[in-house]
């Protein structure tokens, strides 16, 4: 067993034991603190500043030691606003890293980076806590068996299936549907698998965090009547927080997920929205700490910081953490160092396309750009693999023909190519799907489609059995039977109009 959760927080009891320092300098969220000789705190130790500001308001700021400067000074990054702090204020070294509550007490609750509840539902049981900094599991503890994680979303399960205990990246620019896709996955997984999820909101909009919380209460993922029956713990460090909080909130969420995996021996889902904001916060902190920037202005420690987070997300003999991470792609440039570094850690990538979103095809998952290491015949089986490859070939041929169609029109294509285009357009529309969490916007009830149903549907389109049906019948439906029923309805409607 790897985790040794402590049974109380890093509180210091008597005055004699306290290691006290004083603030020597404040630059935004970065504090320099002077300690007595021989009493220097360790790197990553939590420091607490308590006192009153100039107007008598209570101040309680937690910081994390980042650098030992020499001359008995340390440089620390604040986890909350430094408003009201002054030079000379007393600082307490807790002699331990930040520790957060873990276990069943966290379910159904919203926490900040320090593990404090922020949902006005009273205190949380903090008898079991874990430090947020920990090494990754040893090789001998890792579990290497391969199995598919069914999501109920057609395009994902068929073309870029997720690995149980793997890491999945959701790539896309602003406004193409990353957060909606994450909400749908949380919903489907809670209902279909009954698993526990931990959601880490890293540097995203407060409104989205609130919407997600309300959505979860409505869908029953969070049980208001009996909080302990809830299926998710939420940890937020949103856009308005200082960079220190945004940089560490991912580790807080991961620590809670690790406890469910290692101690409760459960399969856990860890959602991080957005991993780019973790890198962005690290970049801000790096500049404030005086490090020389690297490529495109990012921190020189980018790969190390990313690795220390990602390597802890894995399957062990006790349980698994399957992680789904939204990755904002700055200016839709996949070669930017932040998304490029993230790619190296992923088992599957789900790339969202602005072109598909513009066509109104949701989820706007690009079927040709999205990849998965799981799409191999020995893992998914021959039937699934063959169907996925034929779907990709058809869509790729359609993509190649689009320039010819734009210049010369469909009539100039050969009979075979025209058939390919017709089927590709049906496939493109059949890859769309109504979501449970988007019912409010679309008015269509959400659909969960099993993998076997998904494969059957695409096989029927590819075989030519459904060539007579109109394209519109395949748009925003669940399984293939719904598409044929929709085609009949469309036919009836068109007859009535005549």
From Swiss-Prot:
CDD domains: ATP-synt_F1_beta_C, ATP-synt_F1_beta_N, F1-ATPase_beta_CD
GO CC field: chloroplast thylakoid membrane; mitochondrion; proton-transporting ATP synthase complex
Molecular-function GO term, any one: ATP hydrolysis activity
Residues noted as binding ATP in the record, renumbered to the chain: 172-179
E.C. number(s) listed in UniProt: 7.1.2.2
Principal subcellular localization: plastid
Membrane topology of this protein: Peripheral membrane protein
GO biological process, one term: proton motive force-driven mitochondrial ATP synthesis
Keywords, ordered alphabetically: ATP synthesis, ATP-binding, CF(1), Chloroplast, Hydrogen ion transport, Ion transport, Membrane, Nucleotide-binding, Plastid, Thylakoid, Translocase, Transport
Reactions performed catalytically: ATP + H2O + 4 H(+)(in) = ADP + phosphate + 5 H(+)(out)
Keyword field contains Nucleotide-binding: yes
Subcellular location: Plastid, Chloroplast thylakoid membrane
Gene3D superfamilies: 2.40.10.170, Bovine Mitochondrial F1-atpase, Atp Synthase Beta Chain, Chain D, domain 3 (1.10.1140.10), P-loop containing nucleotide triphosphate hydrolases (3.40.50.300)
Cleavable signal peptide: none
Subunit structure: F-type ATPases have 2 components, CF(1) - the catalytic core - and CF(0) - the membrane proton channel. CF(1) has five subunits: alpha(3), beta(3), gamma(1), delta(1), epsilon(1). CF(0) has four main subunits: a(1), b(1), b'(1) and c(9-12).
HAMAP family: ATP_synth_beta_bact
Family recorded in the similarity comment: Belongs to the ATPase alpha/beta chains family.
Function of the protein: Produces ATP from ADP in the presence of a proton gradient across the membrane. The catalytic sites are hosted primarily by the beta subunits.
Name assigned to this protein: ATP synthase subunit beta, chloroplastic
Source organism of the structure: Buxus microphylla (Littleleaf boxwood)
